[in-house]
Amino acid sequence: MRKFIFVLLTLLLVSPFSFAMKGIIWQPQNRDSQVTDTQWQGLMSQLRLQGFDTLVLQWTRYGDAFTQPEQRTLLFKRAAAAQQAGLKLIVGLNADPEFFMHQKQSSAALESYLNRLLAADLQQARLWSAAPGITPDGWYISAEIDDLNWRSEAARQPLLTWLNNAQRLISDVSAKPVYISSFFAGNMSPDGYRQLLEHVKATGVNVWVQDGSGVVYELFVAGKGKTFTAKPKPDAEIASLLAKRSSCGKDTLYFSLRYLPVAHGILEY
């Protein structure tokens, strides 16, 4: 399964959660099915001992991955074990590997596509709201808002309509905070990007902005080449990152679980 990569170092939480979380992001992969229940439960307990309070599932469906009953059941068990260990749980919904490709469509085609995305997200939210032994503490829309395709107010109207509807309908399923992420790559002026974020925030969806301000720390070193490869940073460097605290009460998130020293020998990377 192709990686869905956070392309910048950190995320700034524009609209804060009800508490300043210290969270770890788990990007579920099919190969994680090899982890035993005992290994996973031990890993979740270790996260709590290290001071983490939140597990963020980046997605619960990725294209056709995690659509089979046995795959979903395993994700449910993993999430339930996290909450049993005392972690809060933010559930990522549907991730489309071709999300950015579809943004090049006409306005009408884009609106139709975003409606299909919303339907898929609602399906995941309903599924996870009804899952036994799980109470999601928040929802994550597994997509990224860039600063290229939504530069003009006219161009961003389909986006804002989608997010308005997503916040309202997902909250109808379970009244928990809804999140999405965004990144700045210099395609807009800083003031224009700020305005875009304000428009998104007005929909009621909380925005995690990848802006390099030290709220999410990458725990890996990416390899060179077109195909994504990565290995964990040295343990001492990771320990230094885990000791950091963000300013102004911002949430601190780390990407990702599989690169933590406590996950070595449990989750492949």
Predicted regions and their residues:
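Hydrophobic helical h-region of N-terminal Sec-dependent signal peptides
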Residues: 6-10
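Positively charged n-region of N-terminal signal peptides that target proteins for export
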Residues: 1-4
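Glycan-processing catalytic domains of CAZymes
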Residues: 19-269
